[in-house]
Amino acid sequence: MNNKKTATNRKGMIPNRLNKFSIRKYSVGTASILVGTTLIFGLSGHEAKAAEHTNGELNQSKNEATAPSENKTTEKVDSRQQNNVEQSTTSNQPKVNESDNTSVKETTEEPQNTTSTQPTKKNNDATANKDNLAAQNISTQANDVSATPKTTTIKPRTLNRMAVNTVAAPQQGTNVNDKVHFSNIDIAIDKGHVNSTTGKTEFWATSSDVLKLKANYTIDDSVKEGDTFTFKYGQYFRPGSVRLPSQTQNLYNAQGNIIAKGIYDSTTNTTTYTFTNYVDQYTNVSGSFEQVAFAKRENATTDKTAYKMEVTLGNDAYSEEIIVDYGNKKAQPLISSTNYINNEDLSRNMTVYVNQPKNTYTKETFVSTLTGYKFNPDAKNFKIYEVTDQNQFVDSFTPDTSKLIDVTDKFKITYSNDNKTATVDLMNGQTNSNKQYIIQQVAYPDNTSTDNGKIDYTLDTDKTKYSWSNSYSSVNGSSTANGDQKKYNLGDYVWEDTNKDGKQDANEKGIKGVYVILKDSNGKELDRTTTDENGKYQFTGLGNGTYSVEFSTLAGYTPTTVNAGTDDAVDSDGLTTTGVIKDADNMTLDSGFYKTPKYSLGDYVWYDSNKDGKQDSTEKGIKGVKVTLQNEKGEVIGTTETDENGKYRFDNLDSGKYKVIFEKPAGLKQTGTNTTEDDKDADGGEVDVTITDHDDFTLDNGYFEEETSDSDSDSDSDSDSDSDSDSDSDSDSESDSDSDSDSDSDSDSDSDSDSDSDSDSESDSDSDSDSDSDSDSDSDSDSDSDSDSDSDSDSDSDSDSDSDSDSDSDSDSDSDSDSDSDSDSDSDSDSDSDSDSDSDSDSDSDAGKHTPVKPMSATKDHHNKAKALPETGSENNGSNNATLFGGLFAALGSLLLFGRRKKQNK
């Protein structure tokens, strides 16, 4: 910069010359505003092998017959996951006692009936809960479930209550059969019995066999809480075992969390599942499941027959032919089977076939003896039907009673032993009879018994006393409740504690959408729900016991103070609390939250013109500076730009650690940091900050313009050269003689003009450097040469005149201009070098000759030569005089010669 000023001052502004200027442009980089949140999804693997919890009893009878073949309509999966299932056994032991008056000895058949059950996680003492003996739950547990937890809180929808009712408003979900995808579907016989004749595996319904429905599944991420999908079972296939399927059928993951709650409709043989808030908390949900199933006895009625077992899971259909055998022995005068176990009260619904062979008896007394069970005479469910068609003894022990004759009122049923024994005289006054009967009765669990329970039948005839026994073993892990036990409710309220005092005030309102999970004393999940629009939740149908309730924390809320005050009904019990039910509802389990305060940070980016690192009142903000905010993990959670006043800010921040990053504008340098009070200094390009329950508007940064260097070099060189040469020559001659006149004029004009201009400019700098070098070189050379030569000759004689004129003009003009400019600094360098060199050379040469001749006599020879010479400014008088005298002598000689010729002529 200084060099340029010096050159300009020396030469000034030269007209008609190139004058250059360097203009530096200041710019500030800009960036677009980007404020957003990244959702980070973590990975969570849920793997375990678990099947549907089934607490079942299957009647087992030893049937000697062979089995038909098994045909499948679709290919079976080769590898099957099977869970170990504990068995409960029903032992049917017909005891044939030989009468005193007969020599015929009948053999005793002892078919062993075994039920297979899937234990749940809850272990109930078999002696304390007799109702556990026969139940087989249908709550399906998924195997190898995997899901990715969602890190963002999604506001849940209120769920339809299934197993447990709550006060939450029911959610009308959408059927998403097309979004739940099933594969590797299979219906397998668990255990099974191989027919020794055919080699085929058969399903023996009364001998410990069950069917297992298996499949893998995936759930689309678009599925939400409240959405539904269905399992549709075919004509010969249903969920459950000998125990009827529960109306409630839940789908669990491997950890026991409920993914979906199912409601079974026996009328349509369909289970409708409703997704819980689990699908709102996790993505990429997939897994597999096993579900205990059974032949639908009222339709699949005949032994050794293959029935097509069909199921449609979502939109995926599957079918397989299964050979069914119930073990009915048509030659046996007394045989019984557990038709089904009621899922609600666990009562045994028994069917007894009497006198299938149609024997004739004179004595026929039927006695039922219960152990662990009792009859309820008031229920009037002890029925006696007379058989009119042998085909009414269906193998499945599920006769169509509408086609039978109800003759119960014709017989006297005598109850004894505290309603644990019932006796009927089937002769009813007749002397003999071959009538056939189907007897149905219901046995209710007796909680006072410590025995696992059994039901014994005897038919005392005049020929033989026949016996048949149905026994049941307990199933460990069954969570089946006592059918006679009273049910209670548990729950209450989740509210917003606006004043943060931990107490429910009248003006404070409930919070909708909080997830609530109910667990038993062993930590097993029993149910889950979501608070309704009033913050209410409730679990119903619970027995006496200890439960735990877990509350989720909605995004933007913080749990309030726990157990404030002395009134448990209006305080907050925290995120996890324990509730005890003892012969009454417990509606005191509440949880309070207050909105988590949000904070802001930011402030100012300014131009520190005096470079002192302090914000002065005269210094202004810089617009368009990009500012990035990171959380403690280094994740970008927001970006912005300073406004026209240099201000910026980030809002809605939780207490925590953050980092603010300023992006340096182009062409500016960071000013000094931490030079004064925190709200007036510069904090640097990256600033760590911790917010603890307050805003922070002290995060500033300053910049100043980078230093620049200008170097200008001007060089002007002017060279003027003028050379003039004039030459005049006049010659007059009069003569009568011959005259020769030679005039030579030489004019040489040489003009050399050299102009050299060198301009070097070197500059190193981190700032901006402008170097202008102008060099003007003007060289003018004028060379004029004039030569005039006049020669007049009058003579009668001969005259020779020679005139030589030489004029030389040399002009040399050299102009050298060297300009060196060196500038070293931390700057950028721009160097412009202009060199102008003008060289003008004018050479004029004029030669003039004037020779007027006036002959006085004949001229023999006349030569006139003239050569223009440059005008030199001098006269050649000697040459003129010589010419004059030469002319005189020539004229005199001519006269003398002329006189002699005249004399001779005379």
UniProtKB/Swiss-Prot annotation:
SUPFAM superfamilies found in the cross-reference section: Bacterial adhesins, Hypothetical protein PA1324
Residues annotated as domain CNA-B: 487-597, 598-708
Motif segment (LPXTG sorting signal): 869-873
Gene Ontology biological process terms from the UniProt entry: cell adhesion
GO cellular component: extracellular region
Signal peptide start and end residues: 1-50
Protein name: Serine-aspartate repeat-containing protein C
Biological source species: Staphylococcus aureus (strain MRSA252)
Gene: sdrC
